[in-house]
Amino acid sequence: EEKWSKIWSEKVLSNKDSDASFSQVIPPPNVTGTLHMGHSFQYAIMDFYTRYHHMSGKDAHWQVGADHAGIATQMVVENNLAKKDVTRKELGREKFLKEVWSWKDYSEEKITSQIKRLGCSVDWNKYRFTLDEGCNDAVIKAFVELHRRNKIYRGYRLVNWDPSLKTAVSDLEVVRQEK
């Protein structure tokens, strides 16, 4: 397996001279942990499509990357610190951010290793992280444009508030209990 994983990770499927193209973006896994079976299943299907289009003569590109997962990553790092009886407030902003980036590097390395072991036909030279400068700039530009068109706005709405994190959280992050 190691031999073939190395061979495939060094190959870039490309038909640059083709007029036809196919591209897809890997739904970026969060740097909160490692890949699970669902990722493997999805990546196998996406790999099939990329290879199929390449063999059909198209310039096929499968964009690979990882997502920062903001609050979820913060929670993972805080939980790891709690095991050492340390809080983010005790660390201070700079040291805490250093811990977060350290965790990101650790988790990202595990994730990329897993994707490589799956033999996915991605172009590792074009790897992206959602907090890379280009990605971040694109998000800011999109929000500014959506705000300019009145598609998003600031207003009064009910939100799920986490009193310990002191921020709004998504419905997916809420543990509901009936009392």
Feature locations, PLM:
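N-terminal, positively charged nucleic-acid-binding surface of large information/translation enzymes
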Residues: E1-K179
